[in-house]
């Protein structure tokens, strides 16, 4: 399954400036906040990536999957990696997740591909 999401970087910047850490902590772990290095484009990309993952799993963000059930890190070549908690990997029968983020013209777009054992 594949999920895609696009986010306005300006919209994310406005939320960060208005709500500061409260906004970030709703959808990013402490290590993800560090990875973003206060760059609005990175924050928007991470938000889009988690939304894309929830869409690939066909559940959205809610009772079955929260923003904090997903974790974003970087590969040695700086590519985004997304993982879920072991509990959620088992719940959704996930074998692997692949991710990509891109930024252009004031937007961040992310794509997630989920391979499951179903």
UniProtKB/Swiss-Prot annotation:
Species this protein is from: Helicobacter pylori (strain P12)
Keyword hit for Metal-binding: yes
Cellular component per GO, a single term: cytoplasm
GO molecular function per UniProt: holo-[acyl-carrier-protein] synthase activity; magnesium ion binding
Binding site for Mg(2+): 5, 51
Function of the protein: Transfers the 4'-phosphopantetheine moiety from coenzyme A to a Ser of acyl-carrier-protein.
GO BP terms in the entry: fatty acid biosynthetic process
Gene giving rise to this polypeptide: acpS
Leader peptide range in chain numbering: none
Keywords: Cytoplasm, Fatty acid biosynthesis, Fatty acid metabolism, Lipid biosynthesis, Lipid metabolism, Magnesium, Metal-binding, Transferase
UniProt-listed NCBIfam families: acpS (TIGR00516), pantethn_trn (TIGR00556)
The protein, known as: Holo-[acyl-carrier-protein] synthase
Catalytic activity, EC: 2.7.8.7
Cofactor: Mg(2+)
Family as reported in the entry's similarity comment: Belongs to the P-Pant transferase superfamily. AcpS family.
Predominant location category: cytoplasm
SUPFAM superfamilies: 4'-phosphopantetheinyl transferase (SSF56214)
Highest taxon listed in the record's lineage: Bacteria
Catalytic activity: apo-[ACP] + CoA = holo-[ACP] + adenosine 3',5'-bisphosphate + H(+)
InterPro entries linked to this entry: 4-PPantetheinyl_Trfase_dom, 4-PPantetheinyl_Trfase_dom_sf, ACPS, Ppantetheine-prot_Trfase_dom
Subcellular location: Cytoplasm
């Amino acid at each position: 399954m594949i999920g895609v999401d696009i986010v306005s970087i300006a919209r994310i910047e406005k939320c960060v400036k208005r709500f500061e850490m409260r906004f970030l902590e709703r959808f990013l772990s402490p290590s993800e906040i560090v990875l973003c290095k206060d760059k609005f484009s990175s924050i928007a990309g991470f938000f889009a990536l988690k939304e894309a993952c929830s869409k690939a799993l066909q559940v959205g963000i809610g009772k079955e999957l929260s923003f904090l059930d997903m974790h974003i890190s970087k590969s040695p070549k700086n590519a985004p990696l997304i993982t879920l908690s072991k509990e959620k990997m088992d719940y959704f029968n996930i074998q692997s997740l692949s991710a990509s983020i891109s930024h252009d013209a004031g937007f961040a777009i992310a794509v997630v591909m989920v391979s499951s054992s179903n």
